[in-house]
Curated annotation (Swiss-Prot):
Protein name, UniProt field: ATP-dependent RNA helicase mss116, mitochondrial
Keywords, sorted A to Z: ATP-binding, Helicase, Hydrolase, Mitochondrion, mRNA processing, mRNA splicing, Nucleotide-binding, RNA-binding, Transit peptide, Translation regulation
Gene3D superfamilies per the UniProt record, alphabetical: P-loop containing nucleotide triphosphate hydrolases (3.40.50.300)
Short motif DEAD box, span: 251-254
Transit peptide: 1-56
Residue ranges occupied by any Helicase C-terminal domain in the UniProt entry: 341-503
Organism expressing this protein natively: Aspergillus fumigatus (strain ATCC MYA-4609 / CBS 101355 / FGSC A1100 / Af293) (Neosartorya fumigata)
Length: 655
């Protein structure tokens, strides 16, 4: 271990790593002072150790562990400007040039100021930091510095790299493709003048293509998701190895473990060099520090790791400060008209109020099929030449898109001035989209934590934002129970479309809601019928436990697909699926009989109702699509994307 430290960090760092530390038990006031203010100085040789300290807490709804081995960082002279790092000889000037000149970032965030010095000293560090606080640059900067000072890589040339596939010095593990790609974008900007080569290994992309790129260009920093990283590193024939790995980073550690990646992370570590033979620094960044994270810390980090807490105990969480409202829908079929009404009124209001921020929203759904269906519907609307929303871009992100498509959606939405991103939960954590004015959640979220993380995509970087939830009246008791204590206010005035009975044969022509309902009906006709049928099935699973009676749930979903999506009757379920969902004896469920169709409907209402003529007048148009559309396993998608260009590839699942 000493030899590895000498080789990698020099004699001073090796001595620092090996000399016994002075341990003292500070007072509570000392602990708080060390956590909240980096200005107060204390001897560097003193390392604070606390046991069940009162300042170790989290705003997370999860039960928090009270670990007894968290070692707090000792405060020193503060770092405020990135140029300070170069002036004090802590970071190579080429890295600082990329940050200050190219990225135009001069002043550090609190997270960067509090973590950079500790990480640059070579210690293993567990940092508790929220997303959107600059933590990516906080770990990338020392990662690059470690590479730049590695004597075996002297002569790095940004004009001509001589890296190989076995030159990997840092591996960064991220829970999602989107976050991994986001980190990679920032890493490549940081590498502009250094000669450091950044590569990615994420699910949803062509593995062979990624391997060839690493083999052709080499790699110093490999960023990826657990499944693909394990796949790449476990292949002994591809030549991608990390025999001299100096840094391992786990970003969003709490989510990595929440998503069940613990075993994959352990497997990845087994594929890396023995840390007793090749010394490496391990960094973990996590918004919360539950027991699962501490268990991973003990398996991964050195015993003398540092804990840097950048979340103040008195800091009010986003979900307690952002204005939040909920709207009660008469039926699920009211959701799309309500969305259209809200967006249209806001955009039209921008003309009257030039100081109003451009509308930029993320709309969350609980299923990928719902996400795709609503995206296709709104896309048909914004493509209309004279529609008020013609200048609003629309994008979709969910796990059934290829990684290339998801990356393009993220990039375009991030850069857009006014846009709507229809998303599943793949963007709910860690993703940073600037200037998001609204987060709108359709239907009850899976759990309280999901609601909070989704809401966190707005009101970032000292900007304001709003949160809205459109919930069915049948979900209301469970919704209020789930989000008890969160300052949600009932809104009864904004949406004229929310309470309209769309099951009636005729709509009131004088109602302001009729305009939006009719626009949705016209647009959804162009959506493939196969996608609508799958949307019906996708609603059954997530909503099954939220209604008091299964019959009420089936009635609500049947109304949605008939009066909202325009299907003549609700789709049939296979006998096996109906039985597995416990719906085989529920009135209103149509069960397929493969000898000939039969229904299990004790009372079979006329689902075509008064809308029959409205839908029938364009039934042929609703079934026949332009030649530039084709059927895929996830629905009938356009062959070319007006906003992105290029051909849509087949969908792939996440690792």
């Amino acid at each position: 271990m000493m030899l590895g430290a000498v080789r990698r960090y020099g004699v001073v760092h090796a001595l620092r790593a090996s000399v016994p530390r002075t341990i003292c038990r500070p007072s509570n006031s000392q602990l708080l002072r060390c956590q909240t203010s980096p200005v107060t100085a204390c001897p560097q040789s003193v390392r604070l150790l606390h046991k069940s300290s009162p300042f170790f807490s989290s705003a997370s709804a999860q039960a928090q562990a009270q670990p007894d081995d968290l070692q707090s960082a000792a405060p020193q002279e503060p770092l405020r400007e990135f140029t300070d790092l170069a002036e004090r000889g802590l970071v190579d000037p080429k890295i600082i040039r990329a940050i200050v000149k190219d990225m135009n970032i001069k002043t550090m965030t609190d997270v960067q100021s509090q973590t950079l010095r500790e990480i640059l000293q070579g210690d293993d560090v567990l940092a508790q930091a929220k997303t959107g606080t600059g933590k990516t640059l906080a770990f990338l900067t020392p990662v690059f510095q470690n590479i730049m000072k590695d004597p075996s890589l002297k002569g790095l040339n940004w004009r001509r790299s001589q890296a190989s596939s076995s030159d990997i010095r840092a591996i960064i593990i991220s829970p999602t493709r989107e976050l991994a790609e986001q980190i990679a974008v920032e890493a490549r900007r940081l590498a502009a003048h250094s000669g450091v080569i950044v590569q990615t290994a994420v699910g949803g992309t062509q593995k062979r293509e990624g391997l060839r790129r690493i083999q052709r260009e080499g790699c110093h920093v490999l960023i990826g998701t657990p499944g693909r990283l394990k796949d790449v590193l476990s292949d002994s024939y591809n030549g991608v190895t990390a025999p001299n790995l100096s840094t391992l980073v786990l970003d969003e550690a709490d989510r990595l473990l929440d998503d069940g990646f613990s075993d994959a992370i352990i497997d990845i570590q087994r594929l890396l060099p023995d840390p007793m033979k090749v010394d490496r620094q391990t960094l973990m960044f996590s918004a919360t520090v539950p027991r699962e994270v501490m268990q991973m810390v003990r398996k991964t980090m050195k015993p003398n790791f540092k804990f840097v807490k950048t979340v103040r105990d008195d800091e009010v969480p986003t979900h307690l400060t952002v204005p939040q409202k909920y709207v009660i829908l008469r039926g699920y079929e009211n959701a799309m008209p309500a969305l259209l009404e809200f967006v249209t009124k806001y955009v039209e209001g921008e003309k009257e109020n030039p100081n109003q921020r451009p509308f930029k929203a993320i709309v969350y759904f609980n299923s990928t099929v719902q996400t795709n269906l609503v995206y296709e519907t709104f896309r048909n609307i914004v493509e209309q030449r004279h529609h008020p929303l013609r200048r609003v871009r629309v994008y979709e992100i969910h796990s059934q898109l290829t990684q290339a498509r998801r990356t393009r959606s993220s990039d375009f939405f991030r850069a857009a001035k006014s846009a709507i991103l229809f998303s599943s939960d793949v963007t709910a954590r860690g993703m940073d989209f600037p200037d998001v004015t609204h987060v709108i959640q359709v239907s009850i979220p899976r759990d309280r934590a999901t609601y909070i993380h989704r809401l966190g995509r707005t009101a970032r970087a000292n900007k304001t934002g709003e949160g809205w939830v459109l919930t069915h009246r049948g979900e209301l008791p469970e919704f209020l129970k789930q989000l008890e204590g969160i300052p949600l206010n009932l809104d009864k005035e904004t949406f004229a479309t929310a309470t309209v009975d769309m099951t009636k044969p005729e709509l009131d022509p004088k109602s302001p809601a009729t305009r939006f309902i009719q626009e949705i009906k016209d647009a959804v006709r162009e959506v493939p019928e196969s996608l609508k049928r799958r949307a019906y099935t996708s609603l059954l699973g997530p909503l099954r436990g939220y209604f008091a009676r299964k019959q009420d749930l089936i009635q609500a979903i049947n109304n949605c697909v008939v009066h909202g999506y325009g299907l003549p009757v609700p789709p049939q379920l296979s006998p096996t699926l109906a039985r597995n969902l416990g719906l085989d004896r529920v009135p209103g469920v149509r069960i397929a009989n493969y000898r000939g169709s039969s229904d299990n409907m004790s009372t079979r209402p006329d689902y075509r109702g008064g809308d029959r003529d409205m839908w029938a007048s364009n039934s042929r148009r609703g079934r026949e699509f332009n030649s530039d559309r084709r059927e895929s396993r996830f629905g009938n998608h356009r062959n070319a994307d007006d906003f992105f260009g290029g051909r849509r590839r087949a969908y792939r699942d996440d690792y």
